[in-house]
Amino acid sequence: MARLPAWLRAAALAAAVLGVGACAVTPPLSGRAPLPPSTVPPPPVVESVPPPLVPPPPFAVTPAPTPPPAVASVVARAAGNAIALILPLESPTYGRAAAAVKAGFVAAAARAGASARVQVIGHGDDGVLPAFAAAVQSGVALAVGPLTRDDLKTVFAMSPLRPRMLALNQADEAAPLPAGVYALTLAVEQDAALLMRVARSEGVNTIAVVGSDAPFQRRFSQAFVAAWRREGGTAPREYRFDANPEQLGALRRALATQPIDAILLAVDANDAALAKSFLRGRVYASSQITDGLPAQMLYDLENVRYIEVPWLAEPDNPAFAGLPRADYDDPVLERLYALGIDAFAVAQMLAEPTPPDRIELDGATGHLSLLPSRTFAREGRVMAIHDGRVLPESPAR
């Protein structure tokens, strides 16, 4: 079977997993409804994925028992300082994404000399409840996970006793997190809000949106428009991107009649160069705009700005010294690897007997700030394409 082009593989995986925060993609980042209360899933399979690039010292792994009986929802008392990393490593759909997060997490733990503190608990598509029961039974100070939105909803709804948690997704943007739960995600909404602030700081007052029907791109453009409106901006005109020559001609004519300062381009990398050729002025785009593109095609994206995680934006940053570079050939997995790195850095602080009320750090996924809602605000790096090169600009903060 022929190997898919890099951009197509990246786009497909991104549609499934890059929205690991607040996603509504196809399939959503779990793809399964929560289990009915009477269903007891099989025990999770522990630690059967390939080792990370630089194998850390061995981890303690606890087998998962049957979930505890239903009682009032409470945070379990810690019996030590161990950190459990709970991921769908055995899932056919999300196993690769989970393995990338795990690789970043254990690499960061090894660099910190804290490998012995980490327990890795892998599970399949229906095994998140036994996995959390195992973490409770072993008395961990903190559980990192779940990774998928549906698994997180399942834990919230059906796990009455759970450790303090650092979730890697968010069940519902509007709902407050339960007691003892924190959230660190790669939510595209945060990138869209930062890009909106960049546009405002550059004097953009009127903007149009040109986007595809891809779920990730629709989420990105909707988040940008919502942030734009919250800041008092007028509702932008929105145009659907269609590669049909007649439709492209109509798009060019429509944009020519509108006095706008900039355009938000929400398309995948394979459509980016064609779409950009019909656009004039400032162009802002999603982080996938360059995923898998050959270097020569970057010349067609001159002056496009987007948000990227520092792990990819600044590979020579001294802050990342001592962390192995994963050879995924896939920016989506690289971003998830970076999420694992930051998850460990945050987990060390949250696993303290009394977690800090304030956390600020410059991480592999961006500048992280703990909010009163116990979610982490994340600001990536602003990137600009000039003369066929992608360069980071000054931080927008």
How should each PLM-predicted stretch be described?
Residues V17-P43:
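Bacterial Sec signal peptide processing site at the extreme N-terminus
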Residues P65-A78, L85-A103:
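Extracytoplasmic "Venus flytrap"
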Residues F105, R111-D125, P178-Y182, V209, ...:
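Short beta-strand elements in bilobed, periplasmic/extracellular small-molecule ligand-binding domains
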Residues L323-S394:
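Segments of small-molecule ligand-sensing domains
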